[in-house]
Amino acid sequence: MPTISQLVRKPRAAKPLKSKVPALGNSPQKRGVCTRVYTTTPKKPNSALRKVARVRLTNGFEVSSYIGGEGHNLQEHSVVLIRGGRVKDLPGVRYHTVRGSLDTAGVKDRKQGRSKYGAKKPKSA
């Protein structure tokens, strides 16, 4: 344990914080190209077929990105925008695709929480 005078000479160094989204590199979003679009199963105790895309980003990183919402139009070579945000029951998936931007269509017939899924306000009759 250091003495007070040692701490005065050289204060304690704070541990550098490790990023949870290293591929974004201090950007809010990044653009990329889908290299593979597939479904995968979540960890126990959940059960589903989660839609995931493998994306090669403009900075060279290749990451797995979750495609939220019901139904999507993504396929190989689609250009997508990804943001941070992990999926707790899918190990290794630390990014989300942004719906309604670039080649990703918004969710059809979405009435509530539309902004998160890139859905336009429906025309009221």
Curated annotation (Swiss-Prot):
UniProt keyword annotations, A-Z: Methylation, Ribonucleoprotein, Ribosomal protein, RNA-binding, rRNA-binding, tRNA-binding
Residues found modified as 3-methylthioaspartic acid: D89
UniProt keyword rRNA-binding, yes or no: yes
InterPro entries: NA-bd_OB-fold, Ribosomal_uS12, Ribosomal_uS12_bac
Biological process according to GO: translation
GO CC terms in record: small ribosomal subunit
MF (Gene Ontology): rRNA binding; structural constituent of ribosome; tRNA binding
Region (Disordered): 1-30, 103-125
Compositional bias ranges of the Basic residues kind: 9-18, 113-125
A Pfam family this chain is assigned to: Ribosom_S12_S23
Domain of life: Bacteria
Family: Belongs to the universal ribosomal protein uS12 family.
Subunit-level organization: Part of the 30S ribosomal subunit. Contacts proteins S8 and S17. May interact with IF1 in the 30S initiation complex.
Function: With S4 and S5 plays an important role in translational accuracy. Interacts with and stabilizes bases of the 16S rRNA that are involved in tRNA selection in the A site and with the mRNA backbone. Located at the interface of the 30S and 50S subunits, it traverses the body of the 30S subunit contacting proteins on the other side and probably holding the rRNA structure together. The combined cluster of proteins S8, S12 and S17 appears to hold together the shoulder and platform of the 30S subunit.
Protein name as catalogued: Small ribosomal subunit protein uS12
Organism: Nitrosospira multiformis (strain ATCC 25196 / NCIMB 11849 / C 71)
